[in-house]
Amino acid sequence: MANFKHKDIIALQDLTKQEIELLLSTAESMREINNRDIKKVPTLRGKTIVNLFYESSTRTRTSFELAAKRLSADTVNISPSTSSATKGETLADTALNLLAMKPDIIVMRHSVSGSHYFLSKKLPCSIVNAGDGVHEHPSQGLLDMLTMKDRFGRLDGLKVAIVGDISHSRVARSNIQGLTKLGSQVFLAGPPTMMPPGVERLGNVTVCDSLREAIQDADVVMMLRIQQERQGKTLMPNAREYARYFGLNPENLKLAKPDAMVMHPGPINRGVEMASSVVDGDQSWILKQVENGVAVRMSMLYHVCEGELE
C-alpha cells in the first residue's frame, strides 16, 4: 500500500486528491476487517492512542476508540470533566504531560479552530483532528465521501447540495475541501446569517438563495444541524420558520434526482432540518454514514502510524 506522507491529519485542505483517494481506498479495505467474525488485526499492536475530547461527542469518540481497538492499539480516553483542564491547565501543558506518557497518536476534539496545528508543533507524535471549532472535521468529510462513493461508485461529476448552518459547520468545510478536489460540484444553501462570506473561494462551490434551488437535480442532499451552541446570538427567528424555508421534507425532496441520497452528520433535530419521514425513508443513508465512520478512522490511524495491514 502506498506511503502516506503526513505525520498528522488535521484538515482535508492539507491533503492532495491522491492522498484523499488513498485514505478512502484503505477505508474500503478496513471494512473487510469489520465484516469478519473476529474484528481485530494486529496492525497497531504496541501503539498507544490518546482520545482527548474537549467537546462532547458520542459517535466520533466511540468510533475512533473502536477503530483503534480493532487495529489492536491501546487507548486512553480523556475528557475535560476528568482532566486538569478544569483546574486551569493550558492546552500546551496538557500536551507536555501527555507526551510524558509517550503516545503514538493523539486524537483531539477542541472548540478552538486551529488548535491542532498548535499541538502538532509542540509534539512529535501524530495528531488526528476529531473536529476543531468551525475549521474542519476531516474524518466526517472522509466518511461522507466514502458513503457517496458506495452509492454512486464515483465522486467526480456528482452534484452535492449542502444545506443549513454553513458558517458554524466544520463538517461543511471538510466536505467542500474533499468533494471539490475529487471533482464534485457543491451547492450551498442556508439563511444569509448562516452563510460565511467568500465561501466560493474554497473550490467549485455555488451559493444558492434557497433550499429548492440547491437541491434541484442533486445527487446528494446533505442537511446540517443548527448549531446554537456556536452562535453568539440566535441567527434564525425560530425552528418552525427554519423548517419552513430550509427544512427537507418528502415534497421538496422530489426536486432532487429520483435516486438521490439523503445524508446528515448528526445529531439530527427531527422536524427542523429534516422531517422524520425523510430521516427514516428509503433515500436516507445516515446509518451507513455511521457504519463507514469506523472504517475511515481505522484508515486514518493506520496511515499516520504506518502500520502493517494483515
Swiss-Prot record:
Pathway: Pyrimidine metabolism; UMP biosynthesis via de novo pathway; (S)-dihydroorotate from bicarbonate: step 2/3. GO terms for cellular component: cytosol. Gene3D superfamilies: Aspartate/ornithine carbamoyltransferase. Pfam families: OTCace (PF00185), OTCace_N (PF02729). L-aspartate binds at K87, R170, R225. The keyword Electron transport does not apply. GO terms for molecular function: amino acid binding; aspartate carbamoyltransferase activity. Catalyzes the condensation of carbamoyl phosphate and aspartate to form carbamoyl aspartate and inorganic phosphate, the committed step in the de novo pyrimidine nucleotide biosynthesis pathway. Belongs to the aspartate/ornithine carbamoyltransferase superfamily. ATCase family. It comes from Pelobacter propionicus (strain DSM 2379 / NBRC 103807 / OttBd1). This is Aspartate carbamoyltransferase catalytic subunit. GO terms for biological process: 'de novo' pyrimidine nucleobase biosynthetic process; 'de novo' UMP biosynthetic process; amino acid metabolic process. Heterododecamer (2C3:3R2) of six catalytic PyrB chains organized as two trimers (C3), and six regulatory PyrI chains organized as three dimers (R2).
